[in-house]
Amino acid sequence: RKGYIDGRSARLMTVTVRPGKPNGAASSFFSGIIREPLAGEPSVCPVSPDVSHPVTSAGATVDGLITVFECSREAYGGRTALNLPGLNVTVQEMLDALERVAGPEVRARVTFERNETIAGIVSRWPKGSSSVRANKLGLFAEKTFDDIIRQYIADCQAGPNAAQALKGYKA
């Protein structure tokens, strides 16, 4: 308040596709509907295909946090949190991207089975976001969800577990 501390806060969008095993978080399916099919595993989506939510890649999130940390107070432009950029997509758009990038066999590994608890939680989340202040810092969301999937695949291919993580994907 008095300017003695230069504190900053950034709101993160849902990071998709997150590596690793599925977890109990309500948002876990956003990664699971991409990660598991690419690994040759089935995935159950607990919400309807028309659910919309802002997502981003792990790399864009890390870049955003570094930029917020390193920018000047003037460039940061305020004392309140800023939204890091996110791509506003529906679950259906995510699955369409999966099919374009990895093919219909991979996409077919995703089925829908509504989970009322998760659907109820997700229904109260933002359907989209804007990031005007982050854009002024040179941060922008990925242009398409295809880009996010391709980045996840590239990250997996460079990692030690590529064979396991991508066993259901043929380039």
Annotate the PLM regions:
Residues 1-51, 58:
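NAD(P)-dependent short-chain dehydrogenase/reductase
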Residues 6, 141-142:
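Residue-level detector of short coil/turn "hinge" positions at structural boundaries
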Residues 24-28, 53-59, 89, 129, ...:
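Residue-level signal for the nucleotide or nucleotide-sugar donor/cofactor binding architecture
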Residues 31, 92-95, 128:
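Short, surface-exposed alpha-helical segments at coil->helix boundaries
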Residues 37, 46, 62-119, 159-167:
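Mid/C-terminal beta-alpha module of Rossmann-like enzyme folds, strongest
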Residues 58, 115-140:
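Conserved C-terminal active-site "lid" loop/helix of NAD(P)H-dependent oxidoreductases
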Residues 59-70, 146, 150-153:
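Amphipathic alpha-helical segments that line or abut small-molecule/effector binding pockets
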Residues 131-135, 143-171:
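Amphipathic terminal alpha-helices
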